[in-house]
Regions:
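Histidine-rich, glycine-flanked metal-binding segment
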Residues: 1-59
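Divalent metal-coordination and catalytic microenvironments
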Residues: 12, 27, 32, 55, ...
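Metal-associated gating/positioning segment near the N- to mid-region
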Residues: 41-48, 53-113
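Alpha-helix-loop-beta-strand connector modules within alpha/beta enzyme cores
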Residues: 59, 110-123, 190-194, 249
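Divalent-metal coordination cores built from histidine and acidic residues
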Residues: 81-172
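Active-site core of metal-dependent hydrolases
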Residues: 171-293
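His/Asp/Glu-enriched, well-ordered alpha-helical/loop segment
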Residues: 268-350
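C-terminal cap of metal-dependent C-N hydrolases
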Residues: 342-392
Length: 393
């Protein structure tokens, strides 16, 4: 779409959780930006082309803050567009696939590549290397708990050079000597400034991690606990009640993120925490090649699972728009629908009817699900593509 072209979305139910707006409105897009919102814009701007979205929900562009999309730097990454614009999601965030030593190459190969249509941002690992080529994941190389992998000076330079796309750190809280302290978490805290730290909650293959109690105590307001709703992570006590450390962390401003993955989201745990008021701040997928065909599938499917556990539709949309933007320090540019903002817009529909959701371990019945129809990314329309599961059917 050139700067001179314009399009009107008409007939949709526009929900902008940031402003509380929920109304049937038209949206005028000119070039890369939203120019106007209101009734009957398709009549006021007859020169604009029209996209009829009657029966659909129109939201700020969805944001998935935990994915793995650095293809070529690990055997488990997915192409960014497969989990991004092709799934109705204009913005995805890679969660720690790269450390400082590889980030420049990954930015050129993935983030800034002309074939990448999705906006890709990144949490980086505080280590120099998290992954190596040929599928040698750090779990196998055992560099995740080797302090020689830390180079604070290099990491500081990379943060400065790539400030436009690095939103914070993703930390696996492994330890070396003292089982109560992760030098990798401490390194991230010393470098992060006002950037958030996303912490991996739970076990880590082949390398020891500090206890959940110590992890939560070390986090700052604005930091993010991903995999917050996994089973056996120390967020519930033996009586099934939220522990004091998780309550205290949330009270001081730590954010809870779903980070579904293959085995890091557990319906019974999530239901209990949500019933007790510990609702996700953000819903993310941790999408990678091992869970794309199931149980995760897509961001819309993951949002549907949270919706089925009690939060309202507005709450679920809020988690992946304004809250996701705020969590990564981009609330000034992303996560809202208003004139002069970049035209990142997601279009969804609700499929009514009994639905069986899977978390990879257990199943749960819901009454409806969200399905992506497509999205605008900076004013360009991308229809949602069939999921691999649908193509195989």
């Amino acid at each position: 779409m050139s700067e001179a072209e314009s399009i009107v979305l008409t007939g949709g139910r526009v929900i902008d959780p940031a402003s509380g707006q929920d109304a049937f409105l038209d949206i005028l897009i000119e070039g890369e930006r939203i120019r106007a919102m209101g009734p009957d814009l398709h009549n006021q701007y007859p020169q604009a082309s029209v996209r009829d979205v009657r029966g659909s929900i129109v939201t700020p562009g969805l944001i998935d803050i935990h994915t793995h999309v650095m293809v070529g730097f690990g055997d488990f990454c997915l192409p960014p567009d497969a989990v991004g614009v092709d799934a109705g999601v204009p913005t995805v965030v890679d969660a720690g696939t790269s450390g400082a030593a590889t980030f420049g190459a990954l930015r050129r190969a993935i983030i800034d590549h002309p074939d990448t249509r999705t906006r890709v941002l990144a949490f980086i690992d505080p280590c120099q290397i998290y992954l190596a080529n040929k599928g040698f994941i750090c779990h196998k190389l055992e560099i995740a708990n080797d302090e020689r992998n830390l180079d604070p000076a290099l990491t500081a330079r990379v943060l400065e050079a790539h400030d436009a796309v690095i939103v914070g750190f993703k930390v696996r809280p492994t330890y070396t000597d003292d089982p109560r302290v992760s030098p990798f978490l401490e390194a991230a805290k010393s470098l992060a400034g006002d950037r958030p730290i996303m912490i991996h909650l739970g076990g880590f293959p082949h390398t020891p991690v500090i206890r959940t109690t110590d992890v939560l105590a070390a986090l700052r307001p604005g930091d993010i606990v991903t995999h917050a709703y996994r089973a056996g992570s120390g967020t519930l006590d033996k009586a099934g009640e939220p522990t004091a450390p998780i309550r205290e962390a949330v009270a001081r401003g730590v954010r809870l993120d779903v980070g579904h993955s293959s085995g890091d989201f557990h319906f019974p745990t999530a239901r209990r925490l949500i019933e007790r008021g510990l609702v996700p701040t953000t819903t993310s997928t941790d999408l990678n090649v091992f869970n794309h065909s199931g149980p995760v599938e897509s961001l819309a499917e993951t949002m549907s699972k949270i919706w089925a556990l009690g939060p309202s539709l507005h709450d679920v949309l809020r988690m992946n728009t304004v809250e996701a933007a705020a969590a990564m320090g981009r609330a000034d540019t992303l996560g809202r629908l208003e004139p002069e903002r970049i035209a990142d817009i997601s279009v969804l529909r609700i499929e009514e009817g009994p639905t069986l959701f899977s978390d990879g371990q257990t199943s749960y019945r819901g009454e409806r699900r969200l399905v992506a129809e497509g999205c605008f990314r900076a004013g360009h329309w991308y229809p949602a593509q069939p999921h691999p599961r649908e193509e195989a059917a």
